[in-house]
Amino acid sequence: MTRTPVGRLFPTATGHDLVLTRTFRASAADVWASLTESERTARWFGPWEGDAGPGRTIRVQMAYEEQQPWCDVRVEECEPPRRLSVSMVDGSGNWLLEFALTESAGVTELRFTQQLGSLDGVAEVGAGWEYYLDMLVASRDGTPRPEFDEYHPAMRSYYETLAERA
């Protein structure tokens, strides 16, 4: 299946924001549960453990990555069911991520943002988040999970061009 990338880059004072969106026919509260309840995050990203809350660190398993590593994720800000901001550090660096939900007439838009200090590796990062957000969609609507090779290297040139124009 051919996937169409939707990521965009916006300049910021410290680099760029990578922004991707998905739309759901569901309430913000229901989509929020898919982002914050361990048994539901396990369906598209991985389970988590710990006592979640602003300023606290939880452990998240990246269940769909090679070797299914666990990583520490710090909850920076949490405004249920509208906004979740987290940071995590792994072998690739420091990740600053935000999930923002906006609901209107029973439809919720998820706006995912990753703050990037550099555009190095944006082709891999962008394709990875396209994959994970489509995993979220599949987990919610019961469609088959996508395969990562539908995203990378397939979306590489899109994100490389995006970075060149940024």
Task: List the model feature ranges, each with a label.
Residues 1-48:
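Hydrophobic ligand-binding cavity/cleft-lining segments
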Residues 2-3, 116-166:
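A conserved amphipathic terminal alpha-helix motif
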Residues 8-10, 49, 74, 96-100:
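Short, surface-exposed charged micro-motifs
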Residues 15-17, 87-140:
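Beta-strand/loop substructures that line and gate deep hydrophobic ligand-binding cavities in soluble
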Residues 23, 42-88, 166:
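Glycine-rich portal/gate segments that line the openings of hydrophobic small-molecule binding cavities
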Residues 26, 53, 70, 124-127, ...:
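Generic recognition of short, well-ordered alpha-helical interface segments
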Residues 28, 76-81, 101-109:
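A short, structured loop/turn motif at beta-sheet edges
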Residues 31, 35, 41, 58-60, ...:
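Hydrophobic pocket/interface hotspot
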